[in-house]
């Protein structure tokens, strides 16, 4: 395995399969988890286009990581006009006290389904960062350029 060769293993996840996440972490197979939080839990059906999405699974993964069993980060890719300040107030509430949180700007690859998606302004990102900073000490903007 990679771990036997001395490599550290990072798992990127959307958090929708908390049982798989827990098994991977508790088995020692994973050293670091990066979890995407797409939006506030109440907005997931709209953003993901899945009316009956079970957001309790995402919350379970968030709570598991908050328990501190593994090093982790949460992150949100900010897409305008899909995100607004209320999203980040609600995200801050459910991730309060997390180790680190990154905001990253949407980058249009040219291969997206919706044509009305665009990157936020630096001012918008800064405003969202300030909202999250009320709940989280280590929050920053990650440059994806």
For the regions a protein language model found, what residue spans apply to each?
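A C-terminal junction/extension of Radical SAM enzymes
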Residues: 126-145
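Conserved AdoMet/S-adenosylmethionine-binding subsite of the radical SAM
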Residues: 1-122
């Amino acid at each position: 395995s990679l771990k036997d060769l001395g490599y550290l293993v990072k798992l990127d996840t959307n958090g929708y399969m908390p049982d798989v996440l827990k098994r991977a972490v508790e088995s020692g197979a994973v050293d670091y988890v990066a979890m995407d939080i797409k939006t506030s839990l109440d907005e997931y059906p709209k953003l993901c286009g899945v009316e009956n999405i079970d957001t309790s699974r995402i919350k379970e993964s968030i709570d598991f990581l908050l328990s501190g069993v593994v090093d982790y980060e949460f992150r949100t890719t900010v897409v305008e006009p899909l995100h607004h300040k209320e999203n980040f107030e609600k995200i801050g509430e459910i991730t309060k006290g997390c180790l680190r949180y990154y905001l990253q700007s949407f980058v249009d690859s040219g291969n997206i389904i919706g044509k009305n998606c665009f990157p936020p302004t630096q001012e918008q990102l800064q405003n969202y960062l300030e909202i999250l900073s009320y709940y989280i000490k280590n929050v920053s903007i990650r440059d994806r350029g």
